[in-house]
Amino acid sequence: MPAPALKMLAAAQRVLVAKGFSGLTLRAIAQESGENSAMVQYYFGNKEGLLKAMIDSVFRDDQEDAAAAMSTVTSDDRLPRFVDGLRTISSSRSFRVFFDVLPYALRNEGLRSRMARAYDWYRRIKLDWLRAEDQAPPSQKQGLLGLSELMTAVVDGLAIQEAIDDGFDTRRAYAVLEFMLQRSLPELLESDLHGGSRPG
């Protein structure tokens, strides 16, 4: 993406966080970025096109940052770093964008499908962090997929609490999560969850 377009995307994120969805106008983005409003239309077409590009941009940045952070982790450090990576994601700028866009995305097929694809990226990130999907036998893959789905929900929920309460500290909850995973993950992987059955 050309440098002016990237500059406008960054400006759009700042406007969205500061002014909300209703304040995200082409004029506001042009003023924030220092670019002409016609250029915003040239690169993104309209507000929906801009939002799609913004969703792709922030989630892709998170994905790349996460992959870089986990690429050199040893097996002994993998689970603590996995949980720390979840905590980093829940505090990232993408969630401020996510919270503002979500109510509108639920009513817009184009934005909703973009969000769904972003969630698929996040679930894949979590599987990649554990380096588990390719190495796991078929009997474990359902449990790993369920774990990635559950961890995505945990990140969302803690991010909401952090966003609405400046005094909320996610470290306590993530410490509990790490404690639980250290003790339950081996049992989970040994359980056959195919078809929704639960470990006995």
Residue ranges, per PLM feature:
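Amphipathic alpha-helical packing segments from all-alpha helical-bundle domains
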Residues: 64, 68, 90-99, 109-135, ...
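Short, basic, alpha-helical segments at the C-terminal edge of helix-turn-helix-like DNA-binding modules
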Residues: 56-62
